[in-house]
Amino acid sequence: MKTLTITRPDDWHIHLRDGAQLTDTVRDISRYMGRAIVMPNLVPPAIDTETALAYYDRIKARVPAGSQFEPLMVLYLTDKTSPDEIRKAKASGKVFAAKLYPAGATTNSDSGVTDLKNIYPALEAMQEVGMLFLVHGEVTDSSIDIFDRERVFIENILSKIVTDFPNLKIVLEHITTKDAVDFVTQASDNVAATITAHHLLYNRNHMLAGGIRPHFYCLPILKRNTHQQALLAAAASGNKKFFLGTDSAPHAKDRKEAACGCAGSYTAHAAIELYAEAFESVNALDKLEAFASFNGPDFYNLPRNSDTITLVKKAWDIPASYPLGDTNVVPIRAGEQIDWQVE
């Protein structure tokens, strides 16, 4: 039987939600991930250090016994985020980054940034203290086609930020296009990107051809096959700028299977297994460990995990749904099989 032992991986982009749902999301992600960068787009969002630390405590209270899982917290940037708040967050030792959500770009982003110039003082402070800048890279102009919003963001906004803040460490989150791959590859060593398992495994045909499959609907939206292939090539290249970020984002079944369904795909139930499938599809299993376990902590200047997990090439059945607080979430690959499992 084929096996693969790798250093324990981390997830550098996940949504754990809050309240009753936390028990289920934390259980899933802590099975084999050592750490996770936890997104702050709650209701209300984690816009200050105090709120982020309270959220940290709620997550830690739900980590199963025996697990060493550690959440890494993120500030939600607003037009009013101050340099002092950035310094306070950095000094806490628990907040590792601040996140740009262009107002209206994705789930719970209404409190986000309306004009980039409003956060320039905060970005100056982040550059000064060494706090990472995480970016949801899509424009929100309704006149821009949804499939072009990442490319336009890179051309019109991100390129300027990189120029204006050359010493700021930036992660372009959940990239979906060849444009993003090329930009990150050519940028300085201070620019990196996360890639999701679902963007490696699927493209827009999977979501739209032969019927609409709402559980593939996420933001940034799945793109055409040529972009999917560029993402696979980047992930499997060994380039240290690309690393694992699931963007696992649970929504209740009835919020997805609706006339106006929510954006987000749930993959925390089988994240590393899905990545193993993706890497195997391009004969690059030997590159999985660096992508999943080395590149992220190296970019964040954190130690790599010291223990290991073992993946086994053995198919298993994915349930039709998983519990999510007082409701249920339909995961990616629901009712189907995944080729790999953690031993």
Curated annotation (Swiss-Prot):
UniProt KW keywords = Hydrolase, Metal-binding, Pyrimidine biosynthesis, Zinc
- Tell me the PROSITE patterns matching this sequence: DIHYDROOROTASE_1 (PS00482), DIHYDROOROTASE_2 (PS00483)
Cofactor comment text: Binds 2 Zn(2+) ions per subunit.
Which residues are the active-site ones? D247
Coiled-coil boundaries: none
Signal sequence bounds? none
Q: A cellular component term (GO) from this record?
A: cytoplasm
Gene3D superfamilies (UniProt xref): Metal-dependent hydrolases (3.20.20.140)
A Gene Ontology annotation in the biological process aspect, one of them, is: 'de novo' pyrimidine nucleobase biosynthetic process
Sites where the protein binds Zn(2+) 2: K99, H136, H174
Q: Give the Enzyme Commission number.
A: 3.5.2.3
Record flagged with keyword Amino-acid biosynthesis:
no
Residues with N6-carboxylysine modification: K99
Q: Which cofactor does it need?
A: Zn(2+)
Q: What class of enzyme is it?
A: hydrolase
A molecular function annotated in GO for this UniProt entry is: zinc ion binding
Could you name the domain of life of the organism this protein comes from? Bacteria
Listed binding positions for Zn(2+) 1 are H13, H15, K99, D247
Per its record, how is this protein called by name?
Dihydroorotase
Q: What is the lineage of its organism?
A: Bacteria, Pseudomonadati, Pseudomonadota, Gammaproteobacteria, Alteromonadales
Tell me what gene encodes this.
pyrC
